[in-house]
Amino acid sequence: IVGGSEATSGQFPYQXSFQD
């Protein structure tokens, strides 16, 4: 799992707009 600056509503912070 790579750490991004955008925390999502999913499980992990991704390097993009990942809405789970």
UniProtKB/Swiss-Prot annotation:
Entry annotated with the keyword Hydrolase: yes
Protein name: Collagenolytic protease 36 kDa C
Sample GO molecular function, one term: serine-type peptidase activity
Region (Disordered): 1-20
Top EC class of this enzyme: hydrolase
Similarity field: Belongs to the peptidase S1 family.
Reactions listed under catalytic activity: Hydrolysis of proteins, with broad specificity for peptide bonds. Native collagen is cleaved about 75% of the length of the molecule from the N-terminus. Low activity on small molecule substrates of both trypsin and chymotrypsin
UniProt keyword list: Collagen degradation, Hydrolase, Protease, Serine protease
Origin species: Paralithodes camtschaticus
